[in-house]
Regions:
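Acetyl-CoA-dependent GNAT
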Residues: 10, 18, 22-74, 80, ...
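Conserved active-site alpha-helix within GNAT-family acetyltransferase domains
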Residues: 95, 107, 118-137, 250, ...
Length: 301
């Protein structure tokens, strides 16, 4: 019997965790709990589907809407987690779930699906190839989490503190000075994700004379894109151009690494657009290197 594709619900939680553990060899209860809670709070930002055969769950898809950080002006849908029961593979469940995901994305005006995979995950790569994904132009960089060298200059380090809900207006203003665009909706979503959806709150703000002048938005998840270890994702980092080259970006990244090391997070990962040369140079100077993971994209026509 063919699998039926339907919305994923909270009642599917135990079945999803059990199926994912059979596929990956480890239970990710906290990850799926966070994702289902996030979808309940913001249903327009999340697309979560289940495949069921004779009432039993045989597959799942977890995806979320991105706000343009992946190079698509209309936004993209990020395919975060995907699984099909090994006993039900090659029966079309994965293909039907992906087709339904694409339909829902088009209905919301989304222009692309994006995801990541390790270059040695041959089963996933084969599925993405069959689904007509292509290599994305973005580079994935990563940094093993270990404490950075201490700055031995006499100047006091910039003040860096945890992100707070009330920082949004300042972050939008700083980002507009950097990009020339009003990305208020994007940053509002990122602040909400950082404060409520991340397994641990690690986003930071840098201050000068009591006023925010820079920020680093990141999440710690125990499951995105098939990560089984603790991996942090750096979504965006920015410093007010009027305070550029004053050490704020380095202070933000250094404090983040210190915090992640204390939490036993293994690595920090980010995606960078090919034309973001200044950001790439900063990250490479800070120790980031090319990841063994690859970015993929599928245009929705």
């Amino acid at each position: 019997m063919d699998a039926t594709v339907r919305p994923l619900t909270a009642a599917d939680f135990d079945a999803v965790v059990a199926l994912d553990a059979r596929i990956g060899g480890a239970a990710r209860c906290g990850y799926f709990e966070k994702r289902l809670q996030a979808a309940a709070r913001h249903p327009r930002r999340h697309l979560q589907l289940a495949a069921a055969t004779n009432g039993a769950l045989t597959g799942f898809v977890l995806a979320r809407k991105a706000g343009g950080e992946y190079g698509d002006p209309e936004g993209a849908v990020v395919l975060e987690a995907f699984g099909v029961d090994p006993a039900a593979r090659h029966q079309g469940a994965g293909r039907r779930m992906l087709a339904r995901l694409e339909e829902l994305a088009r209905e919301r005006g989304i222009s692309a699906l994006v995801t990541q995979a390790h270059w040695r995950e041959h089963g996933i790569l084969s599925f993405l190839d069959a689904a007509h994904f292509e290599l994305a132009p973005r580079r994935i960089l990563e940094l093993p989490v270990q404490r950075l060298p201490v700055d031995d200059t006499d100047a006091p380090p910039p003040l860096v503190r945890n992100l707070r809900e009330g920082d949004l207006e300042s972050l939008v203003r700083i980002d507009e000075r950097i990009t020339g665009q009003d990305r208020g909706d994007f940053l509002k979503a990122k602040v909400d994700e950082a404060l409520h959806d991340s397994a641990i709150q690690v986003s930071l703000v840098a201050e000068d004379d009591g006023f925010p002048v820079g920020f680093a938005m990141a999440r710690v998840d125990f499951g995105d894109f098939g990560h089984l270890g603790a991996c942090a994702s750096l979504d965006t980092i920015g410093v007010d151009p009027r305070f550029a080259r004053h050490g704020f970006a380095g202070a933000l990244l250094g404090q983040m690494i210190e915090n992640l090391a204390a939490l036993h997070v293994e690595r920090l990962e980010t995606e960078v657009a090919p034309d973001a040369l200044e950001l790439q140079r900063f990250l490479q100077r800070s120790g980031f290197t090319p990841s063994q993971r690859v970015a993929f994209r599928k245009a929705l026509r």
